[in-house]
Amino acid sequence: MSGNLDVLQMKEEDVLKFLAAGTHLGGTNLDFQMDHYVYKRKSDGVYIINLKKTWEKLLLAARAIVAIENPADVCVISSRNTGQRAVLKFASATGATTFHGRFTPGTFTNQIQAAFREPRLLLVTDPRADHQPLTEASYVNIPTIALCNTDSPLRYVDIAIPCNNKGHHSVGLMWWMLAREVLRMRGTISREHPWDVMPDLYFYRDPEEIEKEEQAAAEKAVGKEEFQGEWSAPPAEFAQPEVADWSEGVAVPSVPIQQFAPATAAAAAAAAPPVKTGEVFSEDWSTQPATDDWSTAPTAQASDWGGTTSDWS
């Protein structure tokens, strides 16, 4: 389908994106019209989609979209939540008309109602979920393009792009790839440079998950402010008198100096109380009143150490 042109060949980075998003993973059931898009079947019963045929059908769908002169005549519909954000992003990038949410029956056939439209091309996310617009498109001869899984019915589908249309990552990546190829074929962006729009913008996000992330971010910001307010408070300023010279500003009081007599070693020895060896004191000295005056002169001691006799022999 790419005409053996190197420019239109699938790059390695595109294959890695397909594998990371799980685009090659089909369902456990297989429709007979989707049999030639299946590469093999895994041991757990999941069918593997041939990514080469996915890329070829993606280029064919992009050529069909580019062939419409007025981009507003291209109608993009997704009744499932996983594809509504991707559909809005695709319509914003390519200028198509979108119907996200519930499709009002009679939009393509009932000319009386205010929401009547006559598109020249119809794109849907899931042929099973979007069966009503496909049926009405068949009544008014509108060509249709659909993202089809292995178990999707191909009734009223003109161009089927085989891929995983159940996962929100796969659906977002397929709409991102289709929008990029449309812009490249129109000449809006160059093939030599990567597109500055990330595929993450096309992914569906649960509103509860967004609320939890916002709540966690708010709690983190409040905790950070409290922490900074507790530890980064400005220090208290104390007014100190300015003194030019410390020796002049501080008054030094005069203290009289007392003279003390030097104590000799003999007087210190005489003032010490006698100590008896072998005697144990069990009373508390601090509770007993002092009975002896230590400041008085010591009593005269006997000078006779040898007894009554002086005979040492």
Swiss-Prot record:
Database matches in Gene3D superfamilies: Glucose-6-phosphate isomerase like protein, domain 1
Compositional bias per record (Polar residues), positions renumbered to this chain: 284-313
Main localization category: membrane
Residues with site note (Cleavage): 115-116, 133-134
Biased composition (Low complexity): 262-274
[DE]-W-[ST] repeat feature ranges: 230-232, 245-247, 284-286, 293-295, 311-313
PROSITE patterns: RIBOSOMAL_S2_1 (PS00962), RIBOSOMAL_S2_2 (PS00963)
GO biological process, one term: ribosomal small subunit assembly
Post-translational modification: Acylated. Acylation may be a prerequisite for conversion of the monomeric 37 kDa laminin receptor precursor (37LRP) to the mature dimeric 67 kDa laminin receptor (67LR), and may provide a mechanism for membrane association. Cleaved by stromelysin-3 (ST3) at the cell surface. Cleavage by stromelysin-3 may be a mechanism to alter cell-extracellular matrix interactions.
Source species, domain of life: Eukaryota
Parts of the chain that traverse the membrane: none
Keyword Nucleotidyltransferase: no
Region described as Laminin-binding: spans on this chain: 161-180, 205-229, 242-313
Region (Disordered): 262-313
CDD domains the UniProt entry points to: RPS2
Alphabetically ordered keywords of this record: Acetylation, Cell membrane, Cytoplasm, Membrane, Nucleus, Receptor, Repeat, Ribonucleoprotein, Ribosomal protein
Miscellaneous comment text of the record: This protein appears to have acquired a second function as a laminin receptor specifically in the vertebrate lineage.
Function noted in UniProt: Required for the assembly and/or stability of the 40S ribosomal subunit. Required for the processing of the 20S rRNA-precursor to mature 18S rRNA in a late step of the maturation of 40S ribosomal subunits. Also functions as a cell surface receptor for laminin. Plays a role in cell adhesion to the basement membrane and in the consequent activation of signaling transduction pathways. May play a role in cell fate determination and tissue morphogenesis.
PANTHER family assigned to the protein according to its UniProt record, in alphabetical order: 40S RIBOSOMAL PROTEIN SA (PTHR11489)
Family annotation (NCBIfam families): uS2_euk_arch (TIGR01012)
Family the UniProt entry places it in: Belongs to the universal ribosomal protein uS2 family.
Protein name stated in the entry: Small ribosomal subunit protein uS2
Protein source organism: Solea senegalensis (Senegalese sole)
